[in-house]
Amino acid sequence: MYSGRTSYDENTRQLYKLDDNGNFVFVENISLDNYFDLLIDIYRTNDPIDELDCCFKLHDMDTNTNNISDIIKASHSLPVNMGHIDPVFYLGYPVIFIIGVTYFSIIASRKINPSDRLLNEIKEYRLTCQNVYRKKFSINFV
């Protein structure tokens, strides 16, 4: 697993960290469970680079799979099987989708206040993180 500040080699169970010169340096041998705990501890810090780094890695670890075709089959199995059972259920998906789009584009947009303090804080946090990543690691997009 590789990301901005740390790298973990699952085969050799070695943890590497990025030093001030931009090189990955071996730190210690660590198990995958301990690495997961380390990421959670780092994620709780206030450093936005470490927080984003750990967030991406934790997400990768949670969604890791070796067989992508099983995921694709599973994601398509429900509508196909329901279509064989009863076409009304299968044809209901587009209707529900249209109702959802209509609701969120017309009705819900009136209820959401774009000047909401929480939304502004999230936008500021995202911009701050993007700027830090762009400057520190020369990344164009986050």
Swiss-Prot record:
* Mode of membrane association: Single-pass membrane protein
Q: Does the keyword Transmembrane helix apply?
A: yes
Look up the record and report any one GO term of the cellular component aspect. membrane
| Transmembrane residue ranges | 88-108
Residues annotated as glycosylated: 29, 67
Q: Which keywords belong to this entry?
A: Glycoprotein, Membrane, Transmembrane, Transmembrane helix
Q: Where can this protein be found?
A: Membrane
**Protein name in the entry:** Uncharacterized protein R213
